[in-house]
Amino acid sequence: MPGPPASPPPPMLLLLLLLTVGCARAAPLPQTGAGEVPVVEVPSLFVILSVCSLLILIVLIANCVSCCKDPEIDFKEFEDNFDDEIDFTPPAEDTPSIQSPAEVFTLSVPNISLPAPSQFQASVEGLKSQVARHSLNYIQEIGSGWFGKVLLGETYTGTSVARVIVKELKVSASPKEQDTFLKSGEPYYILQHPNVLQCVGQCVEAIPYLLVFEFCDLGDLKAYLHNEQEHVRGDSQTMLLQRMACEIAAGLAAMHKLHFLHSDLALRNCYLTSDLNVKVGDYGIGFSRYKEDYIETDDKKVFPLRWTAPELVTSFQDRLLTADQTKYSNIWSLGVTLWELFNNAAQPYANLSDLDVLNQVIRERDMKLPKPQLEQPYSDRWYEVLQFCWLPPDKRPAAEDVHRLLTYLRMQSQRDSEVDFEQQWTALKPDTNSRDASSSAAFPILDHFARDRLGREMEEVLTVTETSQGLSFEYVWEAAKHDHFDEQGRGHPDEALSYSSMFFPVEVFENSLSDPGPGKQDDSGQEVPVRAPGVVPVFDAHNLSVGSDYYIQLEEKSSSNLGLDPPALLTTEVDKLERAGAEEPRTEEDFFQSSAHPKEASSTEDSRATSIPGSPFNLFSDLDKADDLPSHQKIFDLMELNGVQADFKPAILSSSLDDPKDTCQSDKEKPHKLLDQGPLCLSESLLHQDHFDPLSVQELSENFLFLQEKNLLKGSLTTKEQVSDLQTELKNAGFTSALLESPQRGSESSELEFLENTLDFPLSQGDTRGQNEGAGVRRHSGTSPQASPALLTEEGSPTAPTDPILKPEETKSFRDVRVPEDSICLELGPDPVTVGVEIPATDAKTLDGGNRPPDVTCQSKEALSLTNRHPILVNDITAQGSVESCLPESRQDLQNEPFSEDPLSVSSLEKHSEAAETLNQLNSKAAPEDAALASALSSDSTSQDSLLEDSLSTPIPTSEQSVETPDSLDSVDVREALLESLGSHTPRKLLPPDKPADSGYETENLESPEWTLHPAPEGTADSDAAAAGDSGHSSLPPNPVIVISDAGDGHRGAEGPPQSFTLGPQSSYRDSAYFSDNDSEPDKKPEEVPGTSANALVLVKGQSPPESVVPEESSDVREGCLEAPQDKPDQSRVSTLQNSCHSELQETLQPTPADASRESCPVNDEASSPLSLLNSEPSSCDDLDTQEDRPCTLASTGTNTNELLAYMSSTLDKSLPSHLESSKLKEPDIEGKYLGKLCVSGMLDLSEDGMDADEEDENSDDSDEDLRAFNLHSLSSESEDDTEHPVPIIVSNDDGRHLRSLLKPSAAEAIEQLPEDWKKEKKAVTFFDDVTVYLFDQETPTKELGHCGGEAHGPGPSSPAASSSSPYLGRCMNSESSTDEEGGGFEWDDDFSPDPFMSKTTSLLGSKPSLQTSKYFSPPPPARSAEQSWPHVSPCSRFSISPANIASFSLTHLTDSDIEQGGSSEDGDKD
């Protein structure tokens, strides 16, 4: 272009010049030719025009040239400007030519072509993907860092302009530095949190990498506080600082949640927005702005020494080395940051130089920041949070924990006051061991409940956690604020699936927390916490027959509830001893001082326990005082101290609750003592008694076999394995091997000793028992001064000076179960071990037949007098052959003869049943409450130690269950059956006593634990006691069955209406299901069942009066069954549907005469042992009375669950009537009632039930119920593996004994008789306290589980029998609810429709006599045959112990209120 325009002008000029020149030349030519004229004629105009044209042409050419030159220059400048950015990797869509103006302009378009930003666009919002380098305008530089400069700038987005902070990476940064730079902004780029600084964009398309952050108008918080120091005053500013602290912690928690770490957490890196919100971030200018906060290392690195956690700093060869930040170090820095915040942004350790800080803080670690100067509410707590942050790394709280604590403090600071602040604060405080605990809790199903306890939301929470001990089901009540008892010893870790821990009472909780785990024992070998309930094997959900080590462990502490549950009472008492500050080397020692000497120890310890202020019995005396210790607390303490005691005490408490507190207390204490001392003696005696052992062992073996067949028993349930496991459990639970071995002091030992003594004494008193069933206990009571003192004290507090435990207040608590001073005392063996089965009648008078002299109560002979009040027990023991006939007769007699003492005795003895089932049977009938107590204590101890050691222990649990837990089938059945049998004629509700004696839970269980002794027909009790006593007398010559008839109990039972008796047992029995799972013991016992340990089972296998036993079916169905199987199996079978249930038991028993013999023997043994007698008697009473049609309710311990259920139904039905009356006789929250160890075989097999039937006769109702619940659900669990087996419903009365038998087969004899699978079958679960334990297949923890099994067992009529059994089950199921409150309805009723379950349970129990609802509900609730008789959930749910159809789901929230509701508490599915 330049060429052409330039060239044209010259030619034109030339032409013009030529023309001009030509013209000029032409002019002269003419002149030359003509003259000069032509020259002058040349026109000047032409020349002018030529010049002008030339000029115009030149101008045009110049213009053209200039135009061409300008575009060329601009283009070059543009290229030069773009050269700086040519380094970026051109986008794929860009053309290689960067000179194109169009391409240049595309760069200004949003970063479509920029690869780096596109990587983050997906995860960022707003400007993050929109920020472009060209849209940034730098305003000024505000600082610098290792990376480069930090600039304040603006970004233009559309029509808006926003200020931003730009971090620019230096151009010379290495690739590593580039990566570090980008990663430093990643948390802020990804996180979207109001308290985390936002990175709005990254510019990485060109070399100067840029990170664009949001701008906080008020700058960093440190500068703000410095500037606003004068204004930071007053409450509003304090609240602002508190909110800022929470926001800082929240920001860090948000970062940690996504595993981001803060590189330099300090107040200088917390930025404040215009609305005073704090954002945690890092502009990277800290060092440039606050150089004094940093020190430089030898490698030219700077770090904030005063904010750095000590573990990050070290020195090597005089060189400082720093490690990378961790979450733990961030927490340390957080603490320092918060300290700054509360100290006006003062520098930490301002008085120390950097070197001093390095030495004292970092290296020495001997200095911490002082308390902040800021004055604020709970300033100490705020500082405490800071100190948490400065703990060792592994103990520091998580950022979330700090935030939770700060939030709570801030909320509390804004409130005027909160009563529960300290409590809530304690709950919120991080546990230094929480890290380990959380790691061990693999299944914190409900962990958030415990974690997020900012308010009362934690009042009722069921927490399921997997601990090293297994799956823990923890039900936390408000009262039980210590919701986590994981620190306590639990079942074996391999038992995780089945491990259940339900905690209800505060005392129990506290004790559990304070006490060593169930595996810990006092010097006496007894577990201070509720050891009786301890770790109990639960039927394996999947392979019940493998004898796996699954346990349902109700923390002994929590498992024991109010005195309502004999076990709970004992536990409470024990805990109380500790809690009361009467730290005894062994509560069991206190309770059973002579625990090593079963007989003497029983008496001595009983008296001593009563006399010792710290002893659980004295605790009860305190309970009597009721001012020093809450009844539940005491009860729980006793329970926790030792399962035996727990069983004992609750029975006493139950007595007290039932009627006269004195009598009740004494009764409970006695049962307690019995268990602790007597039960130990009993179990030892029983163990050593051939009759007991053979029958117990045989029945146990059968039960175990059945359970194994049903896969209900796990491998650990194998006889020896189970024994060892159980012994280990018991030892772990605080029961020493001595306890395990009857002579030991442990709760188990005491129980065993008591049982042993009881058995020995019954043997010595076998005649006595046979002679005076009424006087047997009385005679025992009076005859065994040694045991009598404590036992009597416990048994007949009013009588014994040591009965302060049974003070008038206590008497009030137990007024319904009030047993005069003639409370049943059991004398075990040669030395009178007063079972202390004070069968508090509805009135002591009733039990007493009016009033019992205190000494009568205290006399072990009088305790043996239980035979009078539980003649059924005596009869059962004595007349095994005539069990059926005797049972109805005895039951009738008991019913006809008002044995107010008998019911109590039954209850207590049933509680003792675990320790001395025979004694429990005798006592159960005669003194239900005492029987229950003794049974419960014995049951717990035995189940853990004694059962491991002896079959007798197994019987004790039955008794205990019957007495302890209405909810638990065993406790409900035995106690209620006894009450029913004894008090059915003289139905007396111990509802008031139930109310007086709280469940031991500080929560709503207070009402629930009321000892709701259900009156049982006196005639029945008498008959049963007499029959049992007679039978026991004859069949237990070697080991005297302790007829636990209080001095006045026996005759009192005769004199007083059965209501007393009912009161006792009901009172004793708590709404707690105690699947006492002496796996090793029962397993061992089943092996011994053939005839090894006569002692092992209260039921004497050798005894021939099964008929007598059969009569005791309802309350002592087990006992009766144990006895009945020999004589009565046929008769039982012949029985009708009610009979049928009875029959089923008998059938189970019938198949094996040995079982029958064994059953009869246990009955004898039980007759020998007050506990078994008590259990047998109440059951027998009920059974005789109610189950004349169904002879051997408890006897169905065979493998046939349906038979067992049917039998139990009949038993329950018979016992339920009185129990219905006395349903209010809330079983003292004895979840520990021995529901467990009721092997399916023992439950279903009458033959195996021989011993267990006696046990269950003791706990006929509870035991049956428990059996039902236990076997139903456990069987259902098994049944899933096998087919649907009529899951044996753990009957209250039957259960303890039956379970006991299952748990403790006699030595070789029992083992020989036990089926091969008996070990597997031996697994049982013991619930202690008002615990609603829903056992379910761990894989399917839903209600559905129970339905299948329940439906499977449709063949039971929902007749009164079914109804009765249903109430039993309800009790068992209501173990918590019923037990807690009134032993009434089930929480299920509200939560689930009872119809399906009821129909199933009805079917299940249809073949069995239905249990009477009164048993389970303090107010006689409508018969819940369906609910009570849990459907056979064999196919559906392994652990549908709760009404499978209604609530198989184990994770059900249980409330005391529900329990208090009595008949309406659905969570009666304790099992």
Swiss-Prot record:
Give the stretches traversing the membrane: 11-31, 42-62
Where is the PTM Phosphothreonine found along the chain? 783
Q: Which residues lie on this side of the membrane: Lumenal?
A: 32-41
Which segments carry the region annotation Disordered? 510-530, 580-615, 761-814, 885-1197, 1248-1292, 1342-1434, 1452-1471
Tissue expression profile of the protein: Mainly expressed in brain, especially in the olfactory bulb, olfactory tubercle, hippocampus, striatum, cerebellum and cerebral cortex. Weakly expressed in skeletal muscle and not expressed in liver.
Q: Which UniProt keywords apply?
A: ATP-binding, Kinase, Membrane, Nucleotide-binding, Phosphoprotein, Serine/threonine-protein kinase, Transferase, Transmembrane, Transmembrane helix
Q: What is this protein called?
A: Serine/threonine-protein kinase LMTK2
**Organism, as annotated:** Mus musculus (Mouse)
* Upper taxonomic lineage: Eukaryota, Metazoa, Chordata, Craniata, Vertebrata
Gene symbol here is Lmtk2
